[in-house]
């Protein structure tokens, strides 16, 4: 089979996109029906039977709309094909009824609200229009139901019979009889088609039920819902639903404003425009479905914002592409937590603006999480290109300036309350995070500017990051207290209590636990490093070697492990954060009281101390190699001692490359 060329692939992709867009458009009416049912309430003045019947019909409408919403693409197209055919049949019957019984053919003139003429004045012209209309309905009906036999012609003729009776000016009772007979024949044919398709509907329903049950048993409810969510493109459906709803409302409101102002101008004043925007925003979150639709729109905006920032700063991390998921989830949780859709219109607008401020600060925090790794990688890799550093520094500056401006504007227009306190705390925390990142970035850039090893760099970076983590922990505790006060004295809810529990676990407990663990690991590593003997002065010059971890020379001092390997104290301490073994021979790093300084064993470079013959050094090195083999199977050696040393150094170099990526 020949390979598909690029033009054919483009045509195929365009074809698939068109079908996907059509599928999304066909699922949107189901959301309109569900939203209309949820926004309507039964009339309490009616009898109990009528109320129960209305509730049953609403539940049935929600259930049927939900089933149509999750249909497969093929089943969805078939459903709309049959529905369109039945709609054409009903429209044809209504047109025949209205034309036969309610139109004066000798004075027909119908206008719409805009003054546009719909039907011609003269009778023959109206007859021809009715014939063309019924032919269109009949051809569409038989085409959609795929009726190809002689019955298709009879059905079209059946639709034209009432028009023929109208043209021949038959008496009224005969026209009524013809209309009733035509409608009955069309109804019987529709019922017959439904009966024929009922078998297909039964087997399709049974197949879908068995498939869903099978997937539920194998994969569980969560994966089943995720698969359905992706298959029907539910976020796209929500976006189209919300945007079309807002567009329709905007069109109606614009028409009302034009009629109220009695002007033909397309433009409106700024006051009317602001009122229009406020009304659209208020009506755009008046139910749970509309809040979901707004969340889907926010998801799309946040997704492309995140992609733009990633492209601007030059990041390729896949985990940083989750802004389009985090932002809508947070917005929806805030809406549920504050009861946004159930508030009065004025309160809803105020609450929505406050939620958007909180969402903005959260998005800025997420963007900082995107820029911080890029900032650290640029500073640690010693890249001097201005084009690489400027975008990240520019975004960091914006992340510092925007929270300051937001806090200034809010404090200038609002009095202090729990919401303003929370937004201000988030802004101050973000500014401190940016300061910490820029400080660490500056330290690494200073270290890269000098060629000498800066042994205190790790300590300074740890102090800066620890200070930032402690301040962040304090802010987490303060925000927990602010949320507790809000829940007890302002607006308590189960969702707020649940979110406070999550905040206490992730932002307080886990952060404190991880910080304490890091502190203890560092403290233990420092104790172990301080317990190791140190080489300085002339003896350090006699070694004339480099550290096996960082490959830098020993300039000031070196630490000797119990297995008589030597490293920089800083490098060995970083290694001990990861594992408690020697990087060279993988023995435990510990100090015993009876261990003394022994330089009669080979070190990193096979250094032979003075007053010792090479033959003795080789014999002792071979004996030491045998002992290492007996103690640890992870080292490889041959009869040649030098080959063993080379293998160990290569192994250590690979570990050191992985270790050097850690900046803690």
Swiss-Prot record:
Induction: Down-regulated by sterols (at protein level).
Broadest EC class assigned to this enzyme: transferase
EC number: 2.3.2.27
UniProt entry tagged with the keyword Lipid metabolism: no
One biological process term in Gene Ontology: endoplasmic reticulum mannose trimming
Annotated tissue distribution: Highly expressed in testis, placenta and adrenal gland. Moderate expression in heart, brain, liver, skeletal muscle and pancreas, and low expression in lung and kidney.
Ranges annotated as biased composition (Basic and acidic residues): 616-628
GO cellular component, one term: membrane
Annotated keywords: Acetylation, Chromosomal rearrangement, Endoplasmic reticulum, Membrane, Metal-binding, Phosphoprotein, Receptor, Transferase, Transmembrane, Transmembrane helix, Ubl conjugation, Ubl conjugation pathway, Zinc, Zinc-finger
Post-translational modification: Autoubiquitinated. Ubiquitination is induced by sterol and leads to ist degradation via the ubiquitin-proteasome pathway.
SUPFAM superfamilies xrefs: RING/U-box (SSF57850)
Gene3D superfamilies found in the cross-reference section: Zinc/RING finger domain, C3HC4 (zinc finger) (3.30.40.10)
Biased composition (Acidic residues): 629-639
Comment block on domains: The RING-type zinc finger domain mediates ubiquitin ligase activity.
Protein name, per record: E3 ubiquitin-protein ligase RNF139
Organism, as annotated: Homo sapiens
